[in-house]
A protein has these predicted regions:
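Cofactor-/ligand-binding subdomain signature composed of acidic, glycine-rich
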Residues: 1-34, 39-40, 119
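Glycine-rich phosphate-binding loops that contact phosphosugars or nucleotide phosphates
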Residues: 40-142
């Protein structure tokens, strides 16, 4: 695929994919060091969300961890299904572009009501409902 071909670059998805490299290069991993340490101390992480907000990032993280032999139990599941599970002793990381995904909000609301202390979020918008429910929220700055 040629980066300068209108045949492809007319589509937002293609433009986003082409921009991804620069975004990853600018990512400051130090900003999440405290979260990474907290998750490592728990030893188990569920990555949740709905659709493409969750599937690619979570499956990529799981594959990366397995290739490197990390001693961290990683799982991914849709937020609605995750509501059926006992998540005591798990860190839960919700991925939602809008930060308003209904199923994710319901899951985090229930976990927060139960006093769950390992709730993290990643959204594209600051001050979202999801971020307000998380113990620590991250906002994409791209």
């Amino acid at each position: 695929m040629r980066r300068d071909s209108d045949k492809y670059t007319q589509f937002g998805l293609v433009r986003d994919m082409l921009a991804a490299t620069a975004i990853v290069e600018r990512f400051d991993a130090q900003q999440a060091l405290d979260t990474a340490e907290a998750i490592a101390s728990v030893g188990r992480l569920l990555m949740t969300g709905e659709g493409s907000s969750r599937i690619f990032p979570a499956k990529n993280a799981i594959a990366h961890a397995r290739r490197r032999g990390w001693k961290l139990e990683l799982h991914t599941e849709a937020a609605r299904q995750s509501q059926e599970y006992d998540l005591d002793g798990w860190a839960v990381f919700a991925l939602s572009n809008s930060g308003r995904t209904r199923e994710v909000i319901e899951l985090f609301s229930k976990l927060q009501q139960r006093g769950h202390e390992q709730l993290y979020s990643l959204t594209a918008f600051a001050n979202s409902k999801l971020e307000s429910l998380a113990n620590k929220g991250y906002v994409l700055a791209c």
